[in-house]
Amino acid sequence: MRRAILLILTLTVGTSLAAGFSQKDTPINTRYRETPEEAAAREFKEHTAELPPLPDAHSDGWFDIYVDENYGKQPKILLDSLQIMPAPDGSIRYILNIRSDKGYDNLTAEGIFCARSSIGFGNGKLSSYKVFGYGDTVNSRWIQPRNAEWKPIGGTLGRNDALRAVLYQAFCEGGVPADTQGLVQRLKERAGRYAPSMKPHDK
């Protein structure tokens, strides 16, 4: 009988302690619930914007992008074309000219999205890029691809697309700058031939 009473008391005390240990005592806040507004702000929604007039490939305002000594093309980005799309898009739009080794201009209107994390949570979008138009320099117009899609920027990007890997490092690493002036500064610091953070690349 005495043992039964002790057992009942032990169970009663244990239950009381368990009840007193609330979720707020855990290292993870299990009570937090994301609001619809927060979820909407986190989810990506592409902003529809008209393409700008096709620029002159030989005008001022183009910035030379350095990839590496073995990259045979001459990529340039039009600084005046840089813009950050409003939320919930947040991607960076720009115009590239990937000039061939024979001097042919290849203009593209593109966007790059910088994810906050390398891991997608829920509907969170991963880092990716998209081509919105190809430049027709003969007829001075953009040709929009029929099935343009955002292409994920994965671990193989550096090997398969060295140019956009440089743009990703310039725009995305360390967070997206607050304005276009910050984007221009990033390009000069990280993507130029004589970027301050890099040694001169001339042989």
Curated annotation (Swiss-Prot):
Q: What is the lineage of its organism?
A: Bacteria, Pseudomonadati, Pseudomonadota, Betaproteobacteria, Neisseriales
InterPro entries listed in its UniProt record: CNP1-like_dom
Protein name, per record: Cryptic neisserial protein 1
What is the additional note?
Was suggested to be clpB, but this protein is not that chaperone.
The answer to whether UniProt assigns keyword Translocase to this entry is: no
Give the family per the record. Answer: Belongs to the Cnp family.
Q: List where in the cell it is found.
A: Periplasm; Cytoplasm
Name the keywords, alphabetized. Answer: Cytoplasm, Periplasm, Signal
Q: Name one GO molecular function term.
A: peptidase activity
Q: Which domain of life is it from?
A: Bacteria
**Which organism does this record belong to?**
Neisseria gonorrhoeae (strain ATCC 700825 / FA 1090)
- Gene behind the chain: cnp1
From the UniProt annotation, give the residues forming the signal peptide. Answer: 1-18
The record's Gene Ontology biological-process terms are: proteolysis
